[in-house]
């Protein structure tokens, strides 16, 4: 005990140093505590201000906390969707951009013969009508790309042909549009300008120009309806309250009604690596394929489906997906992506896409050519994730064809 007391008495500098260190530590702790308190007060004041702002923004329906939904003018600039018309700019109508995602890949094929067309607001004078199309070419890609460039224009022209300003029924519109599209493809050689390069298939074998064709599944989505026209084995499926509903039926040569039609026209269905028209084509309806007419027809089957609050999504895809993925599985994948991404934000117009969506950069290569949007862009992350995941699923399941997928969000009130 004496030694300890003596040592403490003989080392006053150490005691002073310890005291200074303790004082500094206490001062630092007090400073940190003070900073935390100030930050806590700032956060509390910020929460109070946000709560006050949200109460002021609450609508007459008494739902505080709802953020104002963003709308977009024709110029693409976002702004709040106020109810007062006087506060809206007089130039440019208000439009809510559709939510969609698209993915298209060559897959295990040597060449890319798929084409995708997305044309938001393709009927500007008739309200919010959005055009989506998937075209799966065979023999060559020129028929699919021609459909990609022209189908929406033909549909718009036929839609506006009603007498005395009346709108023609959608069934008639689609049937006439597909017939016109088929005629344009058949007359391609005579209508092609000298400056336009010839298709590779024409350069190699000019006499086989009519040996190419394409499927066509087209959807026109309005606020109240989904109109689908299909020729071939591409498919449209809608998910409604968790249940997949096919809006088109594949045109296979061995489908009983198609087999009867082909045989009535004098043709035959030969089983050569599956059922094929004259042993050649594995589908019974398509755009083009002039050498197989009248057995292969371009007449589409058209469905007009009324939209409901239970509708979740619309999926358009080539048979590269549907050959290996069921309707149920595809809808489950999309719903999972929607769930993981939460409620959708207002869709953003992809850069460079005007409201008429008539011009876009076209690129060749491994990915499909997508007109109306840049092939790398979608307007909604959840839809884009779903389209990408479905494509990867098809490739993982050894799909042997090009794979093109379009996913459209149909949910309301979000």
Swiss-Prot record:
Gene3D superfamilies the UniProt entry points to: PPM-type phosphatase domain (3.60.40.10)
Record field: transmembrane: 15-37
Keyword Manganese in record: yes
Top class in the EC scheme: hydrolase
Lineage: superkingdom: Eukaryota
GO BP annotations listed: regulation of intracellular signal transduction
Chief place of localization: membrane
Domain PPM-type phosphatase: 99-410
CDD domains hit by this protein: PP2Cc
One Pfam family of this chain: PP2C
Residue numbers binding Mn(2+) 2: 136, 319, 401
A GO term for molecular function: metal ion binding
InterPro entries, alphabetized: PP2C, PP2C_BS, PPM-type-like_dom_sf, PPM-type_phosphatase-like_dom
Membrane topology, from the record: Single-pass membrane protein
Cofactor binding: number and manner: Binds 2 magnesium or manganese ions per subunit.
Binding site for Mn(2+) 1: 136-137
Subcellular location: Membrane
Compositionally biased residues, Low complexity: 355-369
Reactions it catalyzes: O-phospho-L-seryl-[protein] + H2O = L-seryl-[protein] + phosphate; O-phospho-L-threonyl-[protein] + H2O = L-threonyl-[protein] + phosphate
Keywords: Hydrolase, Magnesium, Manganese, Membrane, Metal-binding, Protein phosphatase, Transmembrane, Transmembrane helix
Protein name according to UniProt: Probable protein phosphatase 2C 9
